[in-house]
Amino acid sequence: MQLEYTVKGGGILRGFTKEDIAYALYELSLAPSSCFQDWLKDTASRINVQFGYVIRYQYPHHFVDDLARHGLIMRSV
């Protein structure tokens, strides 16, 4: 079953796993990093500075879960 998330601003992300969703965010990022794992860590750090949210970045599915928990992305039904 395909997952679908909406980001603030209306963009739609689709994938079969939460890792696919995290990677789609990485590909759309305006703050690229040399590798996906570095991007997860750097993005989690930026979110913490901007909003005070703690976003786990060690595993992509935790990253997506935390973004959704804080309302930064929304799972479509």
Segments and roles (model prediction):
Residues 1-31:
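N-terminal acidic leader/helix
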Residues 2-3, 45, 64:
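Exposed boundary/loop context
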Residues 16, 48-49, 61:
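Protease-labile, long low-complexity intrinsically disordered regions enriched in Pro/Ser/Thr
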Residues 20, 35, 39, 62-63:
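Exposed alpha-helical structural elements
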Residues 21, 43, 66-67:
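Short linear motifs in intrinsically disordered/low-complexity regions
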Residues 25-56:
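Acidic, aromatic-enriched beta-alpha/helix-loop junctions
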Residues 52-77:
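Short, compact, well-ordered microdomains
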